[in-house]
């Protein structure tokens, strides 16, 4: 049975990990054993934070909508209830964008929500 030499595959594996750790400080960027752990942890953080990003952006949109709606003399929860009643199907991302970029258009939507609540 011939002997297996692993130099080529080991070097390729090490190069791949060190390349992924490019830019890391200290031994995390150039020592394989430590770089491997750092890259794995970075991957875990990336996986976790891709999911957290969705929560964070939703919270940001809600904060922006709430601020814009309070300028119109209404609270966020009442506004959302009014939108549901008026059957206006705009998501929070679009509403937040309107609140920032098109104040007149957003004010019209708020008026529709108020009208639906009073009717």
From Swiss-Prot:
Q: Name one GO molecular function term.
A: structural constituent of ribosome
Q: Which residue ranges traverse the bilayer?
A: none
Q: Which UniProt keywords apply?
A: Ribonucleoprotein, Ribosomal protein, RNA-binding, rRNA-binding
Q: Might you report a single GO cellular component term?
A: ribosome
Q: Which GO terms describe its biological process?
A: ribosomal large subunit assembly; translation
Keyword check for rRNA-binding, yes or no: yes
Known role: Binds directly to 23S ribosomal RNA and is necessary for the in vitro assembly process of the 50S ribosomal subunit. It is not involved in the protein synthesizing functions of that subunit.
Q: Which family does it belong to?
A: Belongs to the bacterial ribosomal protein bL20 family.
Q: Under which name does UniProt file this protein? A: Large ribosomal subunit protein bL20
What organism is this sequence from?
Bordetella petrii (strain ATCC BAA-461 / DSM 12804 / CCUG 43448)
